[in-house]
């Protein structure tokens, strides 16, 4: 069946926050948070304006995701507004790859440091287990200390590095740390 997720939590500062799977109706807000977060940090994959996603594309993507049994997009909602998203996707449909899922997350900088990243990450781990994955994977820019600490805290371990993983517009290299979490 499809992957469903819904959790109400209270952040460390007392703010109520809802984690739930994103659907087609969230397209506008999910796209807004994608575009916003990509202007706020150098640590994400795409530059602002590089993603050709329209609200229509996003609707289709979220509709597919909502109907899928092996991928999910979870949003963090505060006061009716989406402030962050995280998701898991299948790495490959071949039999030898089906146990592996990839994890990605982005959160509005205004909400950093409040435990939302941790809550979203734990939600995705739970969903990955439910979907039958036995390994969750991610890459993180080496300088992104806060993200690395979070991933280590929830149990991810480093298995390799790519010293030239990203190349920035200024021509600098960003080293990527490859991390994995065994779920079985």
Which residue stretches match the model-derived regions?
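Acetyl-CoA-dependent GNAT
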Residues: 12, 50-110, 121-122, 127, ...
């Amino acid at each position: 069946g499809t992957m469903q997720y819904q959790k109400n939590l209270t952040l460390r500062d007392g703010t109520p926050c809802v984690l739930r799977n994103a659907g087609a109706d969230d397209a506008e807000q999910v796209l807004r948070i994608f575009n916003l977060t990509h202007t706020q940090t150098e640590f994400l994959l795409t530059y602002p304006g590089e993603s050709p996603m329209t609200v229509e594309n996003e609707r289709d993507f979220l509709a597919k995701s909502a109907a899928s049994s092996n991928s999910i997009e979870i949003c963090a909602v505060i006061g009716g507004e989406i402030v962050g998203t995280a998701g898991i996707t299948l790495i490959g449909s071949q039999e030898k790859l089906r146990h592996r899922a990839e994890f990605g997350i982005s959160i509005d900088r205004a909400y950093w440091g409040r435990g939302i990243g941790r809550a979203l990450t734990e939600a995705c781990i739970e969903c990955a287990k439910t979907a039958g994955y036995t390994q969750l994977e991610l890459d993180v820019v080496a300088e992104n200390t806060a993200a690395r600490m979070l991933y280590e805290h929830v149990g991810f371990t480093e298995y390799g590095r790519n010293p030239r993983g990203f190349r920035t517009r200024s021509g600098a290299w960003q080293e990527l740390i490859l991390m994995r979490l065994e779920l079985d």
